[in-house]
């Protein structure tokens, strides 16, 4: 993903950074958050044609991931935190890529793209050296990434956005699982490059040819 971001650490903040940011009471800050309430989030502000963004990760979340690192195995103790970390980093990288390409990006597209990315990343970690996931592990991952979450945002439109992004991501991931590696890579590149409408059209096209 050509985001133009060479050093991610410059765009990451913790509890103190979040307090300082909100303490300035800057107007116009858009928030893109994970499914975790009061959890990590991507903060975006556009002023005078320039986009400023950063990702907030709670200190407690990073502490938990350091105690139970995903590279040593994924289970119920770290799957939610690791999924949220991947999701927010994907938001930042996609936003950077779209800004660099002078293209717009919707909140729905950010969520849809991140849902696909976090499944692919976590599946790789969960599979380890075994290659593709077996059915039991695939079902376990699907449950933790998509099935168990109930969005409680007070705004119905926000809830619908998260729910719809999850449904479209699952449809695309199911279709990817039916094709070979070379075709899968091509579809992922097409998915990434496409606009929101293009992503949905791709999913519908794959469904029609299944």
Where are the predicted features?
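A metal-dependent hydrolase signature that marks the N-terminal structural subdomain at the beginning
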Residues: 1-52, 73-74
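N-terminal low-structure segments adjacent to metalloprotease catalytic domains
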Residues: 1-3, 126-129, 202-210
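Short coil-to-beta-strand
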Residues: 49-57, 84-88
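Short pre-active-site segment immediately N-terminal to the catalytic Zn-binding motif
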Residues: 62-83, 105
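Active-site recognition of the HExxH zinc-binding catalytic motif
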Residues: 82-96
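Long, hydrophobic, amphipathic alpha-helical segments used as structural scaffolds
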Residues: 97, 122-129, 177-180
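Pan-zinc metallopeptidase signature
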Residues: 151-210
């Amino acid at each position: 993903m050509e985001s133009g971001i060479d050093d991610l650490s410059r765009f990451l903040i913790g509890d103190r950074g979040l307090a300082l940011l909100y303490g300035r009471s800057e107007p116009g800050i858009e928030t893109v958050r994970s499914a975790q309430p009061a959890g990590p989030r991507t903060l975006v502000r556009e002023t005078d044609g320039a986009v400023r963004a950063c990702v907030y990760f709670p200190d407690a979340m990073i502490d938990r991931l350091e105690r139970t690192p995903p590279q040593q195995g994924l289970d119920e103790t770290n799957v939610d935190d690791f999924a949220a970390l991947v999701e927010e980093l994907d938001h930042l990288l996609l936003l950077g890529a779209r800004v660099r390409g002078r293209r717009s990006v919707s909140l729905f597209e950010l969520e849809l793209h991140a849902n696909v990315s976090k499944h692919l990343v976590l599946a790789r970690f969960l599979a380890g050296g075994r290659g593709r996931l077996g059915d039991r592990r695939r079902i376990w991952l699907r449950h933790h990434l998509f099935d168990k979450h109930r969005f409680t945002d007070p705004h119905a439109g926000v809830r619908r956005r998260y729910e719809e992004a999850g449904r479209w991501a699952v449809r695309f991931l199911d279709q990817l699982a039916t094709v070979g590696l070379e075709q899968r890579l091509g579809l992922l590149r097409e998915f990434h490059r496409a606009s929101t409408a293009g992503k949905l059209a791709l999913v519908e096209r794959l469904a029609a040819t299944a």
